[in-house]
């Protein structure tokens, strides 16, 4: 009888639920031991989105919280640390808030959302109203945390007040967990109330983390390491653990052995190489890790369809604004060359500023490099010194994000020059290969090229295919088909002009050796051999132009048969 496999935890960020309902769990419980062994009163973990931050925070809550279900940790690695479990498991009041849902058009609405989060967490401790250890004044203070119209001054003190009341009732200091601490700041910057939100978060944290004598320790998570002067002013007990740090490097994301175990369990080991190429490559500290969101989603697809192709799961969870801003800098020659090196799988050396404010993020190209590194669009392969890193694109998925944004920016620049666009399209329709070639070469000079290393020939051809489609997409009166079945195979691009009397067939090839003339002839021969014109002839198109176009870096050769 075939074994029933555990469910894959897509989007499950509640540790207790994951364990109770028998989802597959990649064991990261030794984070608990390392956190206790490497003591810091306030710990901030910064990692890119979708790398397991929230699940780890939920796991910490499940372990430390008073009267927690110890069965959650049965057969986990931390359960073998018997003395540690006896001393710490289920022994502390835990306050756990997540700020990831604070997204509002105005500061006032964002503040209301923060109040609702505090209200919700305070309601978990309503037994304090019956406590014999709390005075009437204490209970009135607690009631103020339940009010939906809580004053902003109370909100700023709320986590400290709740900590003090819990310690007074239980006789035990409190563990404070704050997940996605930087999301309200990101939204506030985007929507124009950044200074007000910065002040609120600074006051909240100063009360909760600096002047809180009831605090055992705190753990915060986020994507960005916000400047200490911005919201962590005077917080001398803060330990920041970023993607560059060796400590805790294996606990966010899947290691290579984690992925091999998953694939073996689900009988998908034959997909290891493609998963590694698409989703591996991040280096946190000294450990190479995969994006867990990608691995879990792709494995789930493969369980249904073993022929499923890798997709950009991670990139679809964000607008990829940092990459968009970065690509807009490509008009500067140095930046363009650096992006071309990255796309080619090479490394570049940059000084990284890990502490920024959101106001600084896009203020300079130097800061943009730091944002791309911190948020997972670039990773490091080593250091030159404390702040200077060798940077590279981690994997195929991230490379695709760059290529997509490059293409979007290219289309934008094409649309801004209607005269050049009209010249190209008229020449294409008239069979003027010299002008088509000249126009294409001018376009190529203005965009980023695909260099030889790392990239397969098919992918290079796809890139240049995309460039041509990007140009042709603005010719609204033409019917443009891409990879349309015709004759004995598929033509790269098939066009019917507005009068439907002229048809254009384009075959694209990449000249690996740089011999553009020979490769463009090969492209033309393929059109003839595979009878790509059959469909146009069937539709009554009599005037057919056949183009063989060869590309090599920033050059092309165009030949035509009329």
In which residue ranges do the predicted regions lie?
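Structural signature of nuclease core domains in nucleic-acid processing machines
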Residues: 433-562
């Amino acid at each position: 009888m075939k074994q029933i496999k555990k469910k894959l935890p897509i989007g499950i960020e509640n540790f207790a639920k994951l364990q109770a309902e028998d989802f597959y769990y990649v064991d990261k419980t030794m984070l608990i031991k390392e956190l206790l062994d490497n003591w810091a009163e306030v710990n901030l973990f910064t990692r890119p989105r979708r790398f397991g931050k929230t699940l780890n925070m939920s796991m910490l809550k499940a372990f430390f919280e008073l009267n927690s279900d110890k069965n959650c940790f049965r057969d986990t690695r931390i359960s073998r640390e018997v003395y540690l479990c006896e001393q710490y498991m289920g022994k502390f009041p835990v306050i756990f808030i997540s700020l990831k849902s604070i997204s509002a058009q105005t500061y006032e609405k964002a503040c209301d959302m923060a109040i609702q989060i505090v209200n919700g967490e305070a309601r978990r401790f309503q037994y304090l109203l019956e406590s014999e250890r709390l005075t009437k004044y204490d209970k009135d203070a607690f009631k103020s945390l339940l009010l939906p119209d809580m004053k902003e001054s109370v909100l700023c003190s709320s986590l400290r007040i709740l900590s003090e009341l819990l310690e007074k009732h239980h006789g035990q200091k409190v563990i404070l967990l704050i997940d996605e601490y930087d999301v309200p700041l990101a939204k506030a910057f985007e929507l124009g109330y950044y200074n007000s939100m910065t002040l609120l978060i600074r006051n909240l944290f100063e009360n909760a983390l600096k002047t809180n004598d009831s605090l055992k320790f705190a753990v915060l998570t986020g994507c960005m390491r916000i400047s200490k002067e911005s919201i962590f002013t005077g917080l001398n007990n803060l330990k920041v653990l970023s993607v560059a740090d060796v400590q805790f490097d294996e606990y966010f994301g899947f290691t290579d052995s984690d992925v091999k175990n998953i694939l073996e369990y689900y009988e998908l080991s034959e997909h290891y190489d493609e998963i590694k190429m698409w989703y591996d490559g991040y280096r946190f500290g000294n450990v190479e890790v995969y994006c867990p969101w990608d691995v879990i989603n792709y494995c789930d697809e493969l369980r249904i369809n073993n022929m499923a192709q890798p997709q950009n799961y991670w990139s679809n969870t964000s607008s990829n604004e940092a990459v968009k801003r970065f690509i807009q800098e490509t008009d500067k020659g140095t930046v363009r060359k650096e992006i071309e090196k990255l796309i080619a799988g090479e490394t570049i050396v940059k000084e990284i500023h890990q502490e920024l404010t959101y106001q600084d993020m896009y203020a300079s190209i130097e800061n943009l490099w730091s944002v791309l590194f911190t948020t997972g669009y670039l990773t490091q392969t080593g250091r030159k010194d404390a702040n200077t890193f060798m940077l590279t694109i981690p994997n195929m998925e991230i490379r695709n994000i760059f290529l997509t944004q490059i293409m979007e920016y290219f289309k934008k620049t094409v649309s801004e020059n209607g005269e050049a666009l009209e010249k190209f399209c008229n020449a294409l329709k008239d069979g003027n290969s010299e002008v088509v070639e000249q126009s294409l070469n001018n376009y190529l000079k203005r965009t980023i090229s695909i260099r030889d290393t790392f990239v397969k020939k098919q992918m290079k051809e796809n890139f240049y295919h995309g460039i041509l489609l990007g140009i042709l997409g603005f010719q609204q009166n033409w019917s443009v088909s891409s990879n349309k079945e015709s004759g004995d195979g598929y033509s790269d691009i098939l066009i019917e002009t507005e009068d439907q009397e002229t048809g254009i067939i384009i075959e694209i090839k990449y000249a690996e050796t740089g011999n553009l003339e020979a490769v463009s002839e090969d492209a033309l021969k393929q059109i003839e051999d595979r009878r790509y014109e059959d469909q146009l002839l069937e539709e009554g198109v009599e005037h057919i132009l056949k183009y063989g176009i060869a590309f090599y870096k920033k050059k092309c050769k165009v030949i035509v048969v009329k």
